[in-house]
């Protein structure tokens, strides 16, 4: 399946294959040729008149051939020569009458019968065919005469009608308005009216001042007729007709309302300056009030006016919001099936959905569910508008429940061949599966993982599709009850080679970043470790790590030299530190498998891991670096290589880190490096650990048996919604790229809000906020107010032990990393 525009297909017009038919003889061909219509022509082509033997090929015996036509066979009645002569004479005498009847039938006297020469009613005679142009000319002349008469009449009547419209007697004004309305129905007089500014001004004045219904209907009907011409629109606008028309939007009379709204609609579409005039006259408020009516065609015009007024104008959007417009628009989407009304309404919602104030109002009014009702509509323009609107709303609907129908519909439309439809559907799924376990489970249960894998395979190099689809898969492969199943489905659906391939050029950095996070999640499934290695994931991750590390080193050197951050800190809105952190985190998970560890060791990256320990200003990078070293140090040779790279000093310093995860990983690596050291060294090391703040808690260790706990990378943290780099609409509030300042562990400024944190552990996380401290933070799971904002608050299930008795004398395993994280963690650990 490919996403391409439909192409025209050529079809053969030959209903049979001529090669299958026997070739007739030359004589038969000649006979068949002569049976065609050529015998009825002038003889130029067929030779039927001249019949020169050398040209026609007519033999003497052809007259007796039964295949030849009998020219008289169609006439069953025999006429005598006298009868024929009488008919010819009659036709000759009535020729002029026949011509007159065809061209000027109104000149004939009644009762005269004229013989007809028409044998076939389906075939007009030559005279009849020749009469058509003359009839058209006659009608044109008549119309021209009438047009001139209408124009002359209107021109002479306009001055008098203006006086009557300005009369104090309302009865006179009413009669004059109705008369002008009748004149405006004819084109000539209509042009005369619109070319008279005084007449248009008089109509507007009568409209504004009169309370008489007939006057109002006549005047507004005239303005409606004028509004079909640009000159008429300009005349209405210059005469101040817009405030008068807006006032009529409160009329209880249907015909007046229709005239007023259609005239305003024409003005908004074609007359410059009319939008501002309608806004100033309070038209928006009145139009929103009209949404409560139930005439679908009327509502279609009203909603189209609202779309024109709101597009690109924030003030108009806020006025619609203040007038409870979003709820009325959602009601229309839920209540009607008239395609044009649904389309125009979805256009208004699409415009409003990019407004940060209207967005939550639409979501709260049930906009997501109402728009989902029309994803199966046969109208493609309606479906696309609904999808774009849902895409814009989706980052504000990550906490909304009851979206099962929408999610199922989105999975279905992923199978569309329309690029825009698939792009929107993937982006919406990415946002709605962000930080919402229920939505994740729903999408998995309706076949969303398989559909997304198929979408990525079919998309090829279309990043506008692959990026949101990869982000959605990243969400579905971690931190919910069905995540392990999703990880297996990706492998079984042949998605691994395609996903790994996306790490290669020409993929841009936002897509690469998303793929790194997805690979990290897929590696959580032990069954994926070997296939990922075989498809080259480790080589590609290491290559990206080298590139990103070089860029960050160059940047940091420039900062140290110049004291300012260079422009190259971002690439396509993604900081290279994010790539460093993500690749190291993915390698950490992959290194749990022995063959993967051996391959990583062969990539000459241990020195980079050690250098990353010095990134004191980026705690998350220190954590992932210590984490991967912790896994690699399981092999004694690698532990020696780590020590040879000078890791002892930075690891010792990291023991003092306020980040429990960093400190624990550092302790684990140091412990592994000390395995071949003397017992005195181990005791001294153990004693030093107990003096550190992070290790003073006597519940840190489990009676001397310190088994490796759940991987620290499985610790949960905030989801972050996908912001489509290629889509329309506002940036997602959860965006991690697109030029915004990165705020996950890289900025020196503190994070102001913990909103949106989803806390738990491992691929099968429990519900967010299960931590006892969750009540101190509405984002679920944040630290109590006043405590340090360390990314790793631990919640370990360990036995009791006095810290003074802590010793490494008989330990053959490393310290256990923390098992929970209730604070900000690395982006790749999340649904970023």
UniProtKB/Swiss-Prot annotation:
Biased composition, class Low complexity, residue ranges: 767-777
Keyword entries, A-Z: Cell adhesion, Cell junction, Cell membrane, Cytoplasm, Developmental protein, Membrane, Repeat, Segmentation polarity protein, Wnt signaling pathway
Look up the domain of life of the source.
Eukaryota
> Which is one Gene Ontology cellular component term of this protein?
plasma membrane
Q: Which GO terms describe its biological process?
A: canonical Wnt signaling pathway; cell adhesion; neuroblast fate commitment; segment polarity determination
Compartments reported by the entry: Cytoplasm; Cell membrane; Cell junction, Adherens junction
> Record's CDD domains?
CTNNAbd_dArm
- Can you say where the ARM repeats lie in this chain? 146-185, 188-228, 230-269, 272-311, 356-395, 397-434, 483-524, 594-634, 636-675
Q: How does it sit in the membrane?
A: Peripheral membrane protein
Q: Where is the composition biased (Polar residues)?
A: 1-20
Region of interest: Disordered: 1-24, 721-832
- Molecular function (GO) terms listed? cadherin binding
Q: Does the keyword Membrane apply?
A: yes
Which InterPro entries does this entry report, sorted A to Z? ARM-like, ARM-type_fold, Armadillo, Beta-catenin
* Protein's job: May associate with CadN and participate in the transmission of developmental information. Can associate with alpha-catenin. Accumulates through wg signaling; arm function in wg signal transduction is required early in development for determination of neuroblast fate. Arm and Abl proteins function cooperatively at adherens junctions in both the CNS and epidermis.
Family the UniProt entry places it in:
Belongs to the beta-catenin family.
Name this protein carries in UniProt: Armadillo segment polarity protein
Q: What is the scientific name of the source organism?
A: Aedes aegypti (Yellowfever mosquito)
């Amino acid at each position: 399946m490919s996403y391409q525009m439909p192409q025209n297909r050529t079809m053969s017009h030959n209903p049979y294959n001529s090669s299958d038919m026997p070739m007739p003889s030359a004589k038969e061909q000649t006979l068949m040729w002569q049976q065609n219509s050529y015998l009825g022509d002038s003889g130029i082509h067929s030779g039927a008149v001249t019949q020169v033997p050398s040209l026609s090929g007519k033999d003497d015996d052809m007259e007796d051939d039964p295949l030849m036509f009998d020219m008289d066979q169609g006439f069953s009645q025999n006429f005598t020569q006298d009868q024929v002569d009488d008919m010819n004479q009659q036709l000759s005498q009535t020729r002029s009458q026949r011509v007159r009847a065809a061209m000027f039938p109104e000149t004939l006297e009644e009762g005269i019968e004229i013989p007809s020469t028409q044998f076939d009613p389906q075939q007009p005679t030559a005279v009849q065919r020749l009469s058509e142009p003359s009839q058209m000319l006659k009608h044109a002349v008549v119309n021209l005469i009438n047009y001139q008469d209408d124009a002359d009449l209107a021109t002479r009547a306009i001055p008098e009608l203006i006086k009557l419209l300005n009369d104090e007697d309302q009865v006179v004004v009413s009669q004059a308005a109705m008369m002008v309305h009748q004149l405006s129905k004819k084109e000539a007089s209509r042009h005369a009216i619109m070319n008279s500014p005084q007449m248009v001004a008089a109509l507007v004045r009568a409209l504004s001042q009169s309370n008489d219904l007939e006057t109002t209907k006549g005047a507004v009907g005239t303005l409606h007729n004028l509004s079909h011409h640009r000159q008429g629109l300009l005349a209405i606008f210059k005469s101040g007709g817009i405030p008068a028309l807006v006032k009529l939007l409160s009329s209880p009379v249907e015909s007046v309302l229709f005239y007023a709204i259609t005239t305003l609609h024409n003005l908004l579409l074609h007359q410059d300056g009319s939008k501002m005039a309608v806004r100033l006259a309070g038209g928006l408020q009145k139009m929103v009030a009209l949404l409560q009516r139930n005439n679908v065609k009327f509502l279609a015009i009203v909603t189209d006016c609202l779309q024109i007024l709101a597009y690109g104008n924030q003030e108009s959007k806020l006025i619609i919001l203040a007038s409870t417009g979003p709820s009325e628009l959602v009601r229309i989407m839920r209540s009607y099936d008239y395609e044009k009304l649904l389309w125009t309404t979805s256009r208004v919602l699409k415009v409003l959905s990019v407004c940060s104030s209207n967005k939550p109002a639409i979501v709260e009014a049930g906009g997501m569910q109402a728009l989902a009702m029309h994803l199966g509509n046969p109208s493609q323009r309606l479906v696309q508008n609904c999808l774009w609107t849902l895409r814009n709303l989706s980052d504000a609907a990550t906490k909304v429940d009851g979206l099962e129908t929408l999610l199922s519909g989105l999975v279905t439309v992923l199978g569309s061949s329309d690029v825009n439809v698939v792009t929107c559907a993937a982006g919406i799924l990415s946002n709605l599966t962000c930080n919402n376990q229920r939505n994740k489970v729903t999408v998995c249960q309706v076949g969303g993982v398989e559909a997304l894998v198929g979408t990525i395979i079919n998309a090829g190099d279309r990043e506008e599709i692959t990026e949101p689809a990869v982000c959605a898969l990243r969400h579905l492969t971690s931190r919910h009850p069905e995540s392990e199943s999703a990880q297996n489905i990706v492998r079984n659906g042949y998605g691994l080679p395609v996903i790994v391939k996306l790490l290669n050029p020409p993929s841009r950095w936002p897509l690469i970043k998303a793929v790194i996070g997805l690979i990290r999640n897929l590696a959580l499934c032990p069954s994926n470790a070997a296939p990922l290695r075989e498809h080259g994931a480790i080589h590609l991750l290491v290559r990206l790590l080298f590139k990103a590390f070089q860029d960050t080193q160059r940047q940091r050197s420039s900062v140290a030299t110049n004291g300012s951050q260079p422009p190259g800190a971002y690439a396509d809105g993604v900081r290279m530190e994010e790539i460093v952190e993500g690749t190291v985190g993915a390698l950490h998970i992959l290194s749990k498998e022995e063959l993967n560890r051996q391959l990583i060791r062969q990539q000459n990256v241990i020195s980079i891991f050690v250098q990353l320990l010095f990134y004191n200003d980026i705690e998350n990078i220190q954590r992932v670096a210590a984490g991967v070293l912790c896994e690699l140090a399981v092999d004694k040779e690698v532990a020696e290589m780590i020590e040879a790279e000078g890791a002892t000093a930075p690891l010792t310093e990291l023991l003092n880190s306020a980040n429990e995860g960093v400190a624990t990983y550092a302790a684990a690596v140091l412990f592994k490096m000390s395995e071949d050291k003397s017992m005195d060294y181990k005791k001294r090391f153990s004693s030093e650990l107990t003096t550190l703040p992070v290790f003073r808690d006597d519940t840190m260790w489990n009676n001397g048996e310190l088994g490796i706990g759940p991987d620290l990378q499985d610790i949960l943290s905030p989801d972050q919604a996908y912001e489509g780099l290629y889509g329309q609409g506002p940036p997602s509030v959860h965006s991690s790229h697109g030029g915004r300042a990165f705020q996950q562990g890289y900025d020196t400024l503190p994070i102001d809000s913990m909103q949106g944190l989803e806390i738990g552990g491992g691929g099968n996380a429990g519900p967010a906020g299960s931590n006892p401290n969750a009540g101190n933070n509405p984002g679920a799971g944040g630290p109590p107010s006043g405590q340090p904002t360390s990314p790793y608050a631990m919640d370990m299930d360990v036995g009791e032990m006095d810290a003074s008795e802590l010793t490494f004398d008989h330990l053959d395993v490393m310290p256990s990393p923390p098992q929970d994280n209730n604070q900000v963690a690395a982006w790749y650990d999340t649904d970023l």
